[in-house]
Amino acid sequence: MLENLRYIAKEEGLRRFKESLIAYSADLGGLIAGLIVFLRLEVFLSEPWIVMLYPIMITLRGNIGGIFSAKLSTSLNLGYIRPSLRRNTPLFMILFSAINFISLLLSFFSGLIVFLAQIVIVGFKPWLLGIVLLTSLSTQVISMSIAIPVTCALGFISFKRKIDPDVILYPIMSTVTDILVSLTYTVVIIVVKTLIGFIAIFSICIVSSSAILLLMKKYGREVEFVTSVKQILAPLLLSLLIGWFSGLALSNVKSKLEEYPSIMIVYPAIIDTIGNFGASIGSILTARLAEGLVSPKLSLSLLELYETIQMWLSALLYFIVYAYIAFLNGFQNVGVIIICFIASSPLILFTCKLSAIGVFERNLDLDNFVIPLETTFSDFLGTLLLSLFLGII
């Protein structure tokens, strides 16, 4: 075994470590998202529902963006979509319509379940339903209206320059969407509490929702639209439920966030890196399963073990950076941040293997299930462990 491991180490070198070190560098952009929230933390912590909804928005937007990025990349490589925003193929418009419809539907459900949780926490306030739903819908609508064109432009440019969109789209866009969601969410929760702001945001939601429903009316009967919605909706609904538990965990330590505000600076970067650690493993595994290079079993081969250790060490370096940033901003218990990753990584690895094997054996689309479920579970686990450790200290 040791001889085989030495041979693999000699053949592979530190390739995965270097690749993941570069890939995870995009997660540093999550610090910008965290800084946006940190600068208006008093507004963010003013209501339990605001704290609760934020992780759901981050998780939901990331998963929808991840699925869109994966499908766009695959379709570009297969020639089903042209690298142009104008006069593209019908499949592009069907994919565009399906993603927007699902985003609208899930943002409505997000606001609804957060409102129901708010009833349990502080009691029934009927007027709050409109504010929570409007906040959820507008955050998704506004961020989607920017994120989708940016995703398309980045995918088209990279494809034209013979750079594989599969390699760069998801890591870059996951960070971009975190920043977009954090900025949009912060602006919305400030503006929605004023009459003029409420009317303006309500108008944006009505116009955008009407446009999405018109697209659905035009393309909703297409086989590709129905198939995409059916396949994507199930894992995203599960992601939404798990994201809700993340929100509950974070809202339960609201007082600790007030005591240690610097945690919010690094929080988006923490869950991004945990998620991308799992996504890296999941992407490699799903590709090898699809190509028949590995057998569907839970145990790790020596090659998988060697690659996982490299990616784990790469992610650990970033967690040390996050701990140092939190320390510079007044958080003394820096070990909490590092332990979050160390404790969560074995469970994330197990979840990646289990979900990939389960989806593969049922002959389902790996892109639609493995990455969304893995990133959602990673977000939840990172948030849960961070909340638990904050509750203890």
Please identify what each model-predicted range represents.
Residues Q231-S295:
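Transmembrane helical segments that form the transport core of multi-pass membrane transport proteins
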Residues S69-I121, T273, F277-G330:
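Helix-loop-helix junctions within the multi-pass membrane cores of secondary transporters/permeases
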Residues I67-R86, V150-P171, L257-P261, S280-L298, ...:
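Juxtamembrane helix-loop transition segments at the membrane interface in multi-pass membrane proteins
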Residues L129, L133, S138-I146, T151-V181, ...:
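Membrane-interface helix-loop-helix junctions at boundaries between adjacent transmembrane segments
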Residues S20, Y24, V51-N63, N100, ...:
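Transmembrane helix-bundle signature of multi-pass membrane transporters/permeases
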Residues V37-Y54, I58, V253-Y267:
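Interfacial/gating helices of multi-pass transporter permease domains
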Residues K18-V37, F109, L238-S246:
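The first (N-terminal) embedded transmembrane alpha-helix
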